[in-house]
């Protein structure tokens, strides 16, 4: 029986941060679809401008405002919904729901919580209440005690005995959690742990060293019916956060009794918290005996549930939303299979592996070892019919330059067995690569198990891959049976070519000669045990026939996704994929998506006519084209991966949709692009190609420091650096040339004190439609970390006209057809071009939604029909839009927070306003942990660069009414405090905000680090600080639906 609700408010998760990523775009979108099917009016609160769900096709009304209780209350007051869903926006949404309930706001306006009740959520998320609940229902938990102060935590740890695990209540991604082996370690980190808890509570738990970690995904309706959708086995043992673990489904090493016992216990956990919808239950299993504990539960859609949904083909978020409306599991149809109800538990005839992706090399001083705090920024999911096939595919999907488990950089490095074992013991990311290296150098299974705790079942599989590869290398030739066996084990053509000393194309020719090709298999949730036809597909060599017939209809399109997220490639590229798909329906008979990211909307079952959940490579695209005969391949939505394969695809005779591979190569190669600008007479900073040290020194003696090193074919400023002296130059030039050794590195003069701006645009080879965007921070801060404004504020009309002329010239010269982005620096009223990206850009969802024109859709029209103009037409907004970066400093233990030309933010938020400061304030507040400072607290403002702006920020804060100090070691001329004084103030929770600028690690490392560890807002740029602090006193902050600002698409 459905709940009698007419209007439902859905709370989103806000900007992407470590441990709260695009899985909530997927889950929130599915919830909105489920509500719309019921004829229910939907209101969405979400400030994540990059997501698919913040497009008009999902919610009836959209508020891009901070996801906080006080902002959501304004929406409730305006819209008067009768229901609210808080389980589809991660921990952020749950915290907002709990606050709204505990403050009496939901009761005041008569808003019903749909799904799991708030009391159940609190029982799950408070470590103490959860422990008590488990004990009351007779479920085993590890020895543990809760604490709310540092002294209490130390006392409880003494009672339990070291080592202990500190778990944080009302928290995500294990933020602040630690393993302490002694009291000294606990004393050092417990203050940070308590600061990361929403309710200032931690659980001191006996540490279960090397125990196996398992997860069960449970659905439960309000009538008490339950179904276990997936069992996920973590290959990494307890102590490594599940978000950091390599995981596999179905579970491989459990016997039937173990599996069934924990299956029933997971349903008991769901019952104990009155779950309605979906939850994830985590267990610890003793590898040396039959003993297990319940660890925790997440009473909401989560990263694991998104993975389980994509792994099994069971639409968890959709079903969960239906259950929240009051339906039973028996009443809900599984729309993937189309033939079973939601009470059917999935059965798998394949193996799914998820591997996280880290970008730790972008951060200085960050702790590299994997532990109980999540640090990964994305993940990949592979599907195969053997562990080996699935694992090797997953390694390639990571896009870290490794061709598989064996045969890559680490495998052929000079690392000794002892070095490999040391890296394994340290828990460096991508342990399987070090395990393979250790086996290559003679390590035994027992030696690797001793330092990792990873089940020997998996280690034996990796060792067998090493042995097979080494035999291949010695043979230097291959027969038909061996080639087929290699492909079944997940070896790529490139991997085999390297082993045999031949070209990749030679292996492909052999496969074609011997008719060795992958088969297309479908995921139907039922392992073929029940009739079903699905569009959810993967490729495997462990099959004898294709599960589907291939359409001969012409005019077919393959859209390349962006793969696993990393810094610089996030949900904005998935928005581009879905936008292109929606826009292509009127042009193409058959459209398929190739992607492998389990977090995304584009990999959902009801988005494309066909979804190929598989690796993105030239080999795989050619396999698909051979079967499907696609007319076009679209690579411009695939981020850097798409651009990197575009030229090779074109060389293979594949037709690219939009701009040619030759033009993409010109734009991506820094030297070729710089020469193009010279040819067109377009200004750019002085530059030289770094081919020899002598040339570099000659150039620098001419232009002087600072200079900017810019490698080719990279995204998010990888290995890009401003250098100020010879020592820095030598250090970073080495790093840059390692990024892209086959392409020259360009060194250019860095323009100090310049404005940065960019243009998002669509071209048809002649005409251009574009949006001009201005950065708040000066040039030198990566565009992905910059605060952006539409419309521009400081640029003169003369400068903007020159920018538009330059862009128009480039479009004509390169015959740009499709979406693209051009970046400028403006110095002395002269625009200089610094970069051209011939693909969808990070900022395109923002610019499209602010000007109310989908640039991807516009670009497709230009590609296929043309614009009929030969000029630059500027798209302008009806209101102000500001986009702010989201940083995840608190998750990156030890990292030094600073901004530069290499991107460090993990997400973005945006808001609209009637003026710049209206939009800026809401946008900045949308990024965690930003908040309006309490006037009874203290602000800290200091720095040695942008000092005039820091002084403005200090004055604004004083006028606002808060006490302001500066750091005596980097003073701006107001009342000073020493570093030790400031650290004590932060620890005593007196500091409300920190505003600083520049790179001062030798002075203020401790100050910046403890500020983020204690969840204090920190602004790392003086110009932004001056603007945000002015916005604190802005009198007219609006909270309107986006259409009231004339925005949205």
Swiss-Prot record:
Q: In which pathway does it act?
A: Amino-acid biosynthesis; L-arginine biosynthesis; carbamoyl phosphate from bicarbonate: step 1/1; Pyrimidine metabolism; UMP biosynthesis via de novo pathway; (S)-dihydroorotate from bicarbonate: step 1/3
Which GO molecular function terms does the record list?
A: ATP binding; carbamoyl-phosphate synthase (ammonia) activity; carbamoyl-phosphate synthase (glutamine-hydrolyzing) activity; metal ion binding
How the cofactor binds, per note? Binds 4 Mg(2+) or Mn(2+) ions per subunit.
Key word Manganese present in the record? Answer: yes
The keyword Transport belongs to this UniProt entry's keyword annotation: no
ATP-grasp domain sequence ranges: 131-325, 674-864
Positions with a binding annotation for ATP 2 = 710, 749, 751, 756, 780-783, 823, 835
Region: Carbamoyl phosphate synthetic domain; residue ranges are 549-930
Question: Needs which cofactor?
Answer: Mg(2+); Mn(2+)
Query: Binding positions for Mn(2+) 1?
Result: 282, 296
Q: Which SMART domains match?
A: CPSase_L_D3
One Pfam family, short name: CPSase_L_D3
Q: Where is the signal peptide?
A: none
The positions annotated for binding Mg(2+) 2 are 296, 298
Where is the segment annotated Carboxyphosphate synthetic domain?
1-399
Q: Where is this region: Oligomerization domain?
A: 400-548
The record's section on HAMAP family has: CPSase_L_chain_A
- UniProt subunit comment: Composed of two chains; the small (or glutamine) chain promotes the hydrolysis of glutamine to ammonia, which is used by the large (or ammonia) chain to synthesize carbamoyl phosphate. Tetramer of heterodimers (alpha,beta)4.
Q: What does this protein do?
A: Large subunit of the glutamine-dependent carbamoyl phosphate synthetase (CPSase). CPSase catalyzes the formation of carbamoyl phosphate from the ammonia moiety of glutamine, carbonate, and phosphate donated by ATP, constituting the first step of 2 biosynthetic pathways, one leading to arginine and/or urea and the other to pyrimidine nucleotides.
Q: What is this protein called?
A: Carbamoyl phosphate synthase large chain
């Amino acid at each position: 029986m459905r709940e009698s609700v007419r209007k439902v408010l859905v709370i989103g998760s806000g900007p992407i941060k470590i441990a709260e990523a695009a899985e909530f775009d997927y889950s929130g979108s599915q919830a909105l679809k489920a509500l719309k099917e019921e004829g229910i009016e939907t209101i969405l609160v979400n400030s994540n401008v990059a997501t698919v769900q913040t497009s008009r096709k999902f919610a009836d009304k959209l508020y891009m405002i901070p996801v906080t209780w006080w902002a959501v209350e304004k929406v409730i007051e305006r819209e008067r919904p009768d229901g609210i869903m808080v389980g589809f926006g991660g921990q952020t949404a749950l915290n907002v729901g709990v606050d709204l309930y505990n403050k009496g706001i939901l009761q005041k306006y008569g808003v019903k919580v749909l799904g799991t009740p708030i009391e159940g959520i609190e029982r799950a998320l408070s470590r103490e209440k959860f422990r008590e609940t488990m004990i009351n229902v007779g479920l085993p938990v590890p020895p543990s005690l809760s604490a709310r102060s540092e002294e209490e935590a130390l006392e409880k740890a003494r009672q339990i005995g070291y080592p202990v695990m500190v778990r944080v209540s009302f928290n995500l991604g294990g933020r602040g959690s630690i393993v302490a082996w002694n009291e000294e370690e606990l004393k050092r980190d417990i203050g940070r742990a308590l600061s990361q808890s929403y309710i200032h509570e931690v659980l001191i738990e006996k540490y279960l060293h090397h125990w196996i970690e398992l997860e069960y995904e449970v659905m439960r309706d309000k009538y008490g019916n339950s179904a276990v959708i997936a069992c996920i086995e973590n290959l990494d043992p307890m102590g490594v956060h599940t978000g950091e673990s390599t995981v596999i489904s179905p579970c491989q090493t459990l016997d039937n009794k173990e599996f069934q016992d924990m299956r029933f216990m997971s349903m008991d956990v769901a019952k104990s918290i009155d779950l309605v919808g979906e939850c994830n239950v985590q267990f610890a299993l003793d590898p040396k005996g039959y003993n297990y504990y319940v660890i925790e539960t997440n009473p909401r859609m989560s990263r694991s549930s998104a993975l389980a949904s994509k792994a099994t083909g069971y639409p968890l978020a959709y079903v969960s939303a239906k259950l929240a409306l009051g339906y039973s599991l028996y009443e809900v149809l599984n729309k993937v299979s189309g033939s079973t109800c939601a009470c059917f538990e999935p059965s798998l005839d394949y193996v799914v592996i998820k591997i996280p992706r880290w970008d730790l090399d972008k951060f200085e001083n960050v702790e590299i070892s994997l532990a109980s705090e999540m640090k990964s920024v994305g993940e990949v999911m592979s599907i195969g019919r053997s562990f080996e096939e699935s694992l090797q595919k997953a390694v390639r999907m990571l896009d870290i330059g490794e061709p598989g488990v064996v045969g890559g950089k680490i495998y052929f490095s000079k690392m000794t067995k002892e070095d490999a074992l040391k890296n394994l013991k340290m828990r460096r990311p991508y342990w399987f690569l070090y395990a393979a290296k250790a086996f290559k150098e003679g390590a035994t299974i027992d030696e690797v198990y001793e330092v990792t705790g990873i089940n020997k079942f998996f280690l034996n599989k990796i060792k067998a891959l090493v042995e097979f590869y080494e035999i291949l290398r010695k043979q230097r030739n291959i027969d038909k049976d061996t080639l087929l066996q290699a492909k079944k084990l997940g070896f790529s053509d490139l991997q085999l070519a390297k082993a045999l000393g031949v070209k990749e194309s030679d292996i492909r020719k052999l496969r074609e000669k011997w008719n060795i090709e992958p088969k297309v298999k479908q995921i139907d949730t039922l392992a073929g045990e029940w009739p079903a036809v699905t569009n959810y597909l993967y490729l495997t060599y462990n099959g004898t026939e294709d599960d589907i017939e291939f359409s001969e209809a012409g005019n077919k399109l393959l859209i390349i996704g962006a793969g696993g997220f990393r810094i610089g490639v996030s949900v904005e590229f998935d928005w581009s994929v879905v936008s292109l798909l929606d826009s292509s329906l009127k042009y193409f008979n058959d459209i398929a998506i190739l992607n492998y990211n389990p977090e995304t909307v584009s990999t959902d079952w009801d988005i494309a006519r066909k979804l190929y959940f598989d690796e993105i490579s030239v080999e795989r695209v050619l396999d698909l084209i051979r079967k499907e005969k696609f007319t076009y391949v679209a690579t411009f939505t695939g981020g850097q991966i798409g651009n990197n394969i575009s030229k090779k695809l074109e060389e293979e005779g594949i037709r690219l949709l939009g701009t040619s591979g030759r033009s993409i190569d010109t734009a991506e190669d820094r030297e070729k692009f710089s020469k193009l600008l010279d040819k067109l007479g377009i200004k750019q900073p002085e530059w030289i190609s770094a081919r020899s040290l002598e040339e570099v020194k000659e150039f620098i003696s001419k232009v002087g420091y600072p200079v900017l090193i810019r490698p080719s074919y990279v995204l998010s400023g990888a290995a890009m650096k401003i250098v100020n002296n010879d020592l820095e130059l030598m250090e970073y030039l080495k790093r840059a040339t390692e990024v892209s050794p086959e392409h020259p590195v360009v060194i250019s003069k860095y323009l100090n004190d310049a404005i940065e701006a960019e243009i998002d645009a669509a071209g048809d080879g002649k005409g251009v439609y574009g949006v001009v965007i201005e950065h708040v921070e000066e040039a030198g801060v990566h565009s992905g970390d910059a605060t952006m404004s539409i419309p521009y504020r400081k640029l003169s009309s003369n400068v903007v006209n020159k920018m538009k002329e330059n862009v128009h010239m480039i479009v004509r010269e390169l015959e740009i057809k499709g979406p693209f982005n051009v970046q400028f620096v403006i110095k002395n009223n002269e625009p200089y071009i610094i970069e051209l990206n011939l693909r969808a850009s990070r900022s395109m969802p923002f610019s499209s939604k602010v000007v109310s024109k989908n640039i991807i859709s516009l670009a497709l029209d230009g590609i296929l029909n043309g614009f009929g103009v030969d000029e630059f037409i500027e798209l302008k907004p009806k209101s102000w839009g500001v986009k702010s970066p989201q940083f995840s400093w608190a998750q990156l233990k030890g990292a030094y927070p600073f901004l530069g030309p290499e991107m460090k933010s993990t997400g973005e938020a945006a808001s609209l306003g009637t003026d710049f400061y209206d939009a800026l304030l809401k946008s900045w507040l949308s990024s965690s942990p930003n908040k309006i400072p309490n006037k009874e607290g203290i602000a800290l403002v200091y720095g040695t660069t942008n000092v005039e702006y820091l002084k403005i920020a200090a004055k604004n804060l004083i006028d606002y009414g808060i006490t302001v100090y500066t750091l005596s070691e980097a003073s701006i001329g107001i009342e000073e405090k020493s570093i030790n004084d400031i650290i004590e103030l932060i620890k005593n929770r007196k500091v409300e905000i920190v505003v600083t600028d520049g790179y001062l690690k030798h002075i203020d490392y401790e100050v910046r680090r403890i500020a983020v560890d204690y969840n204090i807002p920190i602004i790392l740029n003086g110009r932004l600080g001056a603007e945000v602090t002015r916005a604190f006193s802005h009198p007219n902050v609006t909270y309107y639906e986006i259409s009231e600002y004339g925005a949205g698409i």
